[in-house]
Swiss-Prot record:
The gene is THBS1. This is Thrombospondin-1. Gene3D superfamilies: 2.60.120.200, 6.20.200.20, Laminin, Thrombospondin type-1 (TSP1) repeat, TSP type-3 repeat. Residues 1-18 form the signal peptide. Pfam families: TSP_1, TSP_3, TSP_C, VWC. Belongs to the thrombospondin family. Disulfide bonds join C171-C232, C391-C423, C395-C428, C406-C413, C447-C484, C451-C489, C462-C474, C504-C541, C508-C546, C519-C531, C551-C562, C556-C572, C575-C586, C592-C608, C599-C617, C620-C644, C650-C663, C657-C676, C678-C689, C705-C713, C718-C738, C754-C774, C777-C797, C813-C833, C836-C856, C874-C894, C910-C930, C946-C1167.
Amino acid sequence: MGLAWGLGVLLLLHACGSNRIPESGGDNSVFDIFELTGAARKRSGRRLVKGPDPSSPAFRIEDANLIPPVPDKKFQDLVDAVRAEKGFLLLASLRQMKKTRGTLLAVERKDHSGQVFSVISNGKAGTLDLSLTVQGKQHVVSVEEALLATGQWKSITLFVQEDRAQLYIDCEKMENAELDVPIQSIFTRDLASIARLRIAKGGVNDNFQGVLQNVRFVFGTTPEDILRNKGCSSSTSVFVTLDNNVVNGSSPAIRTDYIGHKTKDLQAICGISCDELSSMVLELRGLRTIVTTLQDSIRKVTEENKELANELRRPPLCYHNGVQYRTGDEWTVDSCTECRCQNSVTICKKVSCPIMPCSNATVPDGECCPRCWPSDSADDGWSPWSEWTSCSVTCGNGIQQRGRSCDSLNNRCEGSSVQTRTCHIQECDKRFKQDGGWSHWSPWSSCSVTCGDGVITRIRLCNSPSPQMNGKPCEGKARETKACQKDSCPINGGWGPWSPWDICSVTCGGGVQKRSRLCNNPKPQFGGKDCVGDVTENQICNKQDCPIDGCLSNPCFAGVQCTSYPDGSWKCGACPPGYSGDGVECKDVDECKEVPDACFNHNGEHRCENTDPGYNCLPCPPRFTGSQPFGRGVEHATANKQVCKPRNPCTDGTHDCNKNAKCNYLGHYSDPMYRCECKPGYAGNGIICGEDTDLDGWPNEDLLCVANATYHCRKDNCPNLPNSGQEDYDKDGIGDACDDDDDNDKIPDDRDNCPFHYNPAQYDYDRDDVGDRCDNCPYNHNPDQADTDNNGEGDACAADIDGDSILNERDNCQYVYNVDQKDTDMDGVGDQCDNCPLEHNPDQLDSDSDRIGDTCDNNQDIDEDGHQNNLDNCPYVPNANQADHDKDGKGDACDHDDDNDGIPDDRDNCRLVPNPDQKDSDGDGRGDACKDDFDQDKVPDIDDICPENVDISETDFRRFQMIPLDPKGTSQNDPNWVVRHQGKELVQTVNCDPGLAVGYDEFNAVDFSGTFFINTERDDDYAGFVFGYQSSSRFYVVMWKQVTQSYWDTNPTRAQGYSGLSVKVVNSTTGPGEHLRNALWHTGNTSGQVRTLWHDPRHIGWKDFTAYRWHLSHRPKTGFIRVVMYEGKKIMADSGPIYDKTYAGGRLGLFVFSQEMVFFSDLKYECRDS
């Protein structure tokens, strides 16, 4: 039995030893990360705690930044092991805080530029993420349903072999994951020199939160052995090979050469050869000797254990100062220390003494505590007297007492222990409660005056009886008063004020003047005395001698005041207004010259006429309104300057627009000066407006407009579906947009391969769903029907796509007309279509869709107008439209002479058209050279949407750039845009990923309007438009959601879209992709992606089959933004003024996100730079 037991123990030890994971030591098969980073260090960012494995330390991560990295030499060994076995096994036990995201291991660059490789437990998404940096770009591979952040202990086994990864959580096998590159290409030979291995440390918010134990890299074993050692059953740990073969003789981290049982090969069934069996017999003979020796050793240990047990059975003893005591014995060491034996332990303690009540206590010899002794004094033994008690009564006579105590054991204590004395605090009050009562009234007093009106008074007292002991006071008045009257008092008279002196009787030589007064202040009454003194008073006046009058000869200028003096001299006053001089002689003042802006200056002419005297202004020029001042003198001319303002019929009420139309002022140089435009919900020519249900600019019924003015007065051929182009191929009065069979070939449009060509046979040779009758390449598959040169021959079959007479195979710009074939940078792409014409870039890559190739795109744009500094014709002045009418390389925004005719812009009457003679035949301030067409683009100003930009004259989205905002997404298609109405109407037909259709016209200040219509009941997502577009990462967007909804994919961020209209500014650090996609869906701010400027607080979503009309105003110079959305005739939503200066202008376009059948109709944009 003993032999069998010993052999079993040895075999068990042998088996466990062969399967045990070796500790890190001299070999490189196991790398314990905590051991390598110095687990025993203090203040190392971790704290030792208990884990599920009692034989290994576990650490709570407190500050991962303080945990040192793995030493470079050990990290190099680890890298060499990974490269040798083309993979690794990573083991770890962890207890991660709930719903947190934390990094288990990370290989970070020493220059802090980022991570090369990391293993992250993403508790928010329930995944284990492997992050790899490949060619400077981060790739993330996730193992789904890896629920590790639960607050419970979890054990993971991660096996990575080349480009495959397999995860086990506890004993449960997760799904395989595939890496973008083999792991050995990440763990390069020089990795340890440029990077370091960190535990628990990730990005800014990705440090691990929780407890870690046994974090190890293991090599030279298999996942089966690892799982078996963990106690996992074979059924749960069956390993499926990852289809990796041994390369160049290296062994993989997990052996993949397992072969299943065979039933006919005996040796294969046994698994051991005969030679191996012979070897095992020899080993077992040697083991027999070892087992015998082991039996002897165990027998000896058993005997020693018995002797030790006998010793333990003896009763316990105590030893103190060499003396032996049994349990329970007590003894005294000295007079103050007592000891006792208790379970082999000696316990000693000091004797505690009581407090003595006497003052003469002493300690007798041989004792530890003091004692009191008898005394001969009678007072000895008494304590001091206590304080007297309170008096026994509060009034009258009472008593007080005090006491003392006696130590009768040690003293005689003669005398009393209590003393008593009398006390008297105050006399007791013998009164009783009594209410007060009035006495009788006193007689009335005599009158207070001897004459006139006075008063008499009487009084009474509250003393019959007086109130006491809180009795009630008397009620009523203690004093009464009433009037008394005597004879009236006499009033003495008083003088009133003197009157003014009257006129002197003569003007010179001495005369008399007098004044008077009345006795009425007051008049004497009731026997009063009259006033004392005279009623009148006289005095002498004008005593001076009479002079000689020098002004009698009229020496001054007509109208000038003359002043004479007694000596016969005289003096003239100032000249009249409009004259200058000394008063004797006065000359006319030229007010037009003295005040050069007294009248309106027009075309360099001061419209002022001088008269004698005075001046007058000429009437305001044609198309101006204002006053016509006239008068005399410089002061009058300065204070009353003529102001002539351009006439505006829209504000002065002289227009003839319909009451349901808006008057748009075009400027006083235009003829006419205004244009009438029907308001949303109405259509017509502006003079006459009728109802327009679908808001496409065409009335529901025919309107009786003036002769030859039928534009937008004709009845809408699809009154309930926007179709601003009114296309009607078969001329049946039903527009193509709502006609089920446009070509009347009895084939419905949704199944007709030529909906606008009669072809009942539906022949389609090239199977591109475009019938041969309408296919511009009937023998070449081209469903897009692209035709760059518009010659009727599709690009797919054209030998010269762009029509420049150069065959495609020799054309360096196949889609752009360029006869010269100039190619400055010799990259095979002609300058006309090269997005970096001066730098070699044959791939033409443009990651941010700003039409500048990545090779030359530096994104440095100091004025934020969408044009980088080295390509901006005004790098320091925002001018998104880059207008340069004289083509001198300097944009109009920073050019003081836009037409280069030598006349500065501020004085040029044709700023954009050269006219050095400045001829202006009608004198209206607009030169003849640009009369009625300011930019000379052959479009009259009244019809020109941008009269000051020769490059833009009408709204046109026929050419647009399609921008995918989630180019890697495969859950939906890219948008499909259908162009109608010469680019003024676009329809997006499919449920798609987020995308834009951006026109090529660029704008500074702009107004943008259009009709929005969803022609389906399917889906409820986003549609809208963009403005200020500069790249796929930088633009403004107005987007509208029908219902509140969370985006289905919560990676990389959770996105909640609320119903209602939103205005957002996109400034993405990542550009198109899943980050921007989720940020656009989310109603709110997403750091580094999107900021919401405004969201409709009423959360009104769009309705199916309902027409809406939007109007956008954007003024980049001030940052002003306003969006108004109409439903029919009424405003449904209004953002009000929003101010944001992120972008100084850009391009316009349309936006969709997961919404099909979106109609954008009757699109209009207008420049607002003036």
